[in-house]
A protein has these predicted regions:
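Glycine-rich phosphate-binding P-loop
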Residues: 1-3
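Helical mechanochemical/support elements of P-loop NTPase systems and associated helical scaffolds
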Residues: 34, 38, 63-66, 70, ...
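Flexible loop/turn segments at secondary-structure boundaries
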Residues: 33-39, 88-89, 114-119, 165-169, ...
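Phosphate-binding/switch loop-helix module in NTP-utilizing enzymes
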Residues: 78-149
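Generic beta-strand/beta-sheet core signal
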Residues: 28-30, 82-84, 110-113, 160-161, ...
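Short secondary-structure boundary/capping segments
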Residues: 41-47, 123-126, 172-174, 209
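Phosphate-binding/switch region of NTP-binding enzymes
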Residues: 14, 20, 137-221
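Cytosolic-facing regulatory segments adjacent to core modules
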Residues: 9-104
């Protein structure tokens, strides 16, 4: 976490977070509204209050006060948000460079890799010959460019992309279901496909749960 404090549910109080004072982070969003959608997620995490309580303005005892204090924490933290709906690589680089130079940002979260009209126009302008670019070519180029930005600015960069309709095939949940450009998987240092486990997958770990964890089920699916 990058917040300077967070609510510890065991201690029932806010506690300092040394990682929050030593690191600056930039979130670049392309779809979700920063104030209405992204900030409530952050406040829910910092205050340990269910997000729907914040969105519905329906608080249990003590939650409203915690959210108010979480707003103050967010303002004091080195957490920066930028909204870039129709992005291209040039815009991303300008945004990242600004925060690296002005705020000493070293961690960037980009939500998320997908096709935009500006992106297509940018790559077509850079192409040596006028040609119709395929979606997989554009997305693969985005992965290459983002990798170059991490080296150029010495930053870590986390991002996401979509999966294709093949995700429904329970026997084929690997890099081949990345939507548009399977080559994206070749550009990442660490990646994962986040999905709820199937019944068959849960059965496979039953022996481990029984022998190691007393049969306790995972608390996150």
């Amino acid at each position: 976490t990058f917040a300077v404090e967070y609510y510890d549910n065991k201690l029932k109080k806010f506690v300092p977070n040394p990682h929050g004072t030593q690191n600056a982070v930039l979130y670049i969003g392309t779809e979700m509204e920063l104030v209405d959608e992204v900030e409530p997620i952050m406040l829910a995490y910092i205050a340990d209050v269910p997000q729907d309580h914040i969105m519905d303005y329906d608080y249990a005892e003590g939650e409203y006060e915690r959210v108010l204090y979480a707003i103050d924490i967010l303002n004091r933290s080195q957490i920066y948000l930028e909204y870039v709906p129709d992005y291209d690589i040039s815009t991303l680089e300008q945004t990242i460079e600004k925060y690296v130079l002005q705020k000493n940002v070293r961690h960037v979260y980009f939500d998320y890799i997908h096709i935009t009209t500006d992106l297509i126009a940018e790559f077509q302008g850079e192409a040596k010959a006028k040609m119709q670019l395929r979606e997989d070519q554009v997305l693969a180029n985005v992965g290459t460019k983002l990798k170059e930005l991490t080296r150029k600015y010495d930053i870590s960069l986390d991002t996401w992309t979509q999966v294709s309709g093949d995700w429904k095939n329970e026997n084929n949940r690997d890099q081949t279901i990345i939507r548009g450009a399977k080559a994206l998987s070749d550009k990442v240092d660490c990646g994962s496909i986040m999905m709820r486990p199937t019944v068959a997958e849960l059965r496979k770990i039953d022996p481990i749960l029984k022998n190691r964890f007393g049969g306790q089920k995972p608390n996150l699916y």
